[in-house]
Each structure stands twice: as structure tokens, then as C-alpha cells.
Amino acid sequence: MSILSFLLGEKKKSASVAKERLQLIIAHERAGGHAPADYLPALQRELVAVISKYVKISHEDIRVSLERQDDLEVLEVKIEIPQA
């Protein structure tokens, strides 16, 4: 990090912001046990908004699911991106 970027501030990239949000969600879920995943619709809407900045997609093109098996939780995101 340079002194100039420190003084002027540097805008975070959307990928790092999304990563931080996902880490917070996962940490919250792990701390609270097996609470219902009521954040999934909001997560799906946010993903559509972010990806729509770069590629034309609709709400139906993204599927988000959370699977639990014993002590393992898997957040799965499937995105259909149209061909150019």
C-alpha cells in the first residue's frame, strides 16, 4: 500500500466486498448453529445486481442453495452466463 493510496483512500473492488460479505454470513451461520438460511434470496438479488453490471442476466439465471450434511455446509452458486 502506498502512502498516496492510504491518504486518498482506495475504493475496494466488488469481488473483495462480496468475499467479505460471504465470510460474515458463513461465520454468523456457524456461530448460531443451524439457523434457517433466510438470507439466500437477498444474496441472490445482490449477485444479480453485481453481475448485471458486466453481463446481461436475469433473476432466473442464478441459483443459490445451501446444503448441510453433518458438520459440513456448502453454499452453492450456479450462474448461467449467455454466450456472446
From Swiss-Prot:
SUPFAM superfamilies to which the protein is assigned, alphabetical: Cell division protein MinE topological specificity domain
Highest taxon above the source species: Bacteria
Keywords attached to this entry: Cell cycle, Cell division
InterPro entries in UniProt: MinE, MinE_sf
Listed GO biological process terms: cell division; regulation of division septum assembly
Family (UniProt): Belongs to the MinE family.
Functional summary from the UniProt entry: Prevents the cell division inhibition by proteins MinC and MinD at internal division sites while permitting inhibition at polar sites. This ensures cell division at the proper site by restricting the formation of a division septum at the midpoint of the long axis of the cell.
Name of protein: Cell division topological specificity factor
Organism: Paraburkholderia xenovorans (strain LB400)
Name of the coding gene: minE
